[in-house]
Amino acid sequence: MEEYSLRSQVFQTIRDDILKGKYEENDELREATLGKELGVSRTPVREALRQLELEGLVNIIPNKGAYVTGISDKDVHDIYMIRSMLEGLCARWATQSITAEQLDSMEETLCLSEYHTSKKNYEKLYELDSLFHEQLYEAGGSRILNHILSDFHDYVKMVRKATISTSSRSVTSTEEHRAIFEAIKEKDPDKAEALAKEHVKHTIESIQAYGLEKIL
């Protein structure tokens, strides 16, 4: 169990570093260097790199090494288009499965988001944006859908952080979250699904307007 936990931690750390932009595309990930940085042997690092290759984030070239693949412009666009459909489904399901406790938690997150939007506290807004989506995925009541959407959400961390830092998008994003929440609270599946889809589509539009080349 401890060995599995260590491998999982090493994988998650390297994965997060790639998604946060610590490495450039084609940077070499040396097992010995990573092991020293993380305080582990080369074995869990090697296993983590193999797992990252399966996710498409790393390219392992035999007898040469492991290199960062990263996320391309097309990857970002594809992720948001897929997320649009799946978050719509999640919001639809949430109208039937959300609990009173989950509604209260989402309401609290929204109130905090609205406050920090007015204060233009973008760092806190990024955290609250992530929290709202986590709560939405949980409210959908599907472990599988939650896992898929959480992975997609992680893949575009850098992009989300950049766009939420613009005042116009932070305001509209918070307003859209509120509308999705109200539709779920009213148990209106068609409205909740449509609003959730539009929210994600508006996000990719703001990303394109901002310029992906400034982020990736």
What is each stretch, according to the model?
Residues 54, 58-59, 152-154, 168-170:
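Mobile beta-alpha loop/short-helix "lid" or hinge segments that flank ligand
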Residues 1-96, 102, 138, 204, ...:
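Short linear motifs at protein or domain termini
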